[in-house]
């Protein structure tokens, strides 16, 4: 789940650690946050005693009443109606729900969605439902599930007549219904593209894997000596994950294109002058030009974000548009944002070390800034 640390998801912090009992080596373990109401309270400005937290279909904290009302409303509503979707956007954290499903589908977690699913809301009139990403050890090509990088987990996640485990009908219902709405559908596609352009990039994932493996590989032999049935074929399993990271993006694009009848994946280039950034859907690039791939059929959202001391001037390609806009992408698409300083020249980083104001009458050193 560490792959999603910068995404709008609730994930457990963790670290590998070595255990010694009375100076005897006891193995390599993972220390993780426990997902309960206190986990929610430590990550959000809410009272942990005043939330609804559901695991699978049972309330661990609070009740299931509000969620049951949500499901009843969805089942009785026309999800193609924009007004219905706008209303649901006040009931569900839509961005979180999209990111959650994108994550589970991409990693091919098939011990879900009828299991290992927790979701919560503050018990407030405007409290929105959010989903927690945890226990994803069936993902990334786990051998005993078969397949992995070539499994169409998107179809799996919308199966209307699945078995009791792992994807029964109740567990896929909300996602299936939301996908009937064109606004949700387009946002889902764009977020998937955002992730494929960034954290789902093969090179990025393999670098993270290699870093994590390097961090613990020296202790694996000692762990195996202590627990002979643990970490069997460790190098092989690391390679399974590496293979998944290498091939999964291409397969996932194919599944998106087939499911949503998409065509014309185009390369888009974004440029920004000194003094600001461009937010592309959910991404704010670290450097420019930034290149991403998006579908010609699906408009993207862009927003010019000026740095302190700068103001947005405009887009040469869209001179009549403001700082935020939704635009189509097309072959050889380029977009540039222009910023200018409003301080009449180059800006500098100013550091104030000391301020003295209104000294005591008995020791008046004047007012000064240093």
Where does each model-flagged region fall?
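Surface-exposed interfaces of beta-sheet-rich extracellular modules
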Residues: 299-323
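Low-complexity, Pro/Thr/Ser/Gly/Ala-rich linker/spacer regions in secreted
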Residues: 257-267, 338-349
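Short, solvent-exposed S/T- and G/P-enriched segments that are highly enriched in secreted/extracellular
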Residues: 282-299, 321-327
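Conserved N-terminal submotifs of small, disulfide-stabilized extracellular modules
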Residues: 264-292
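Conserved "repeat-terminator" motif of extracellular CCP/Sushi domains
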Residues: 270, 325-344
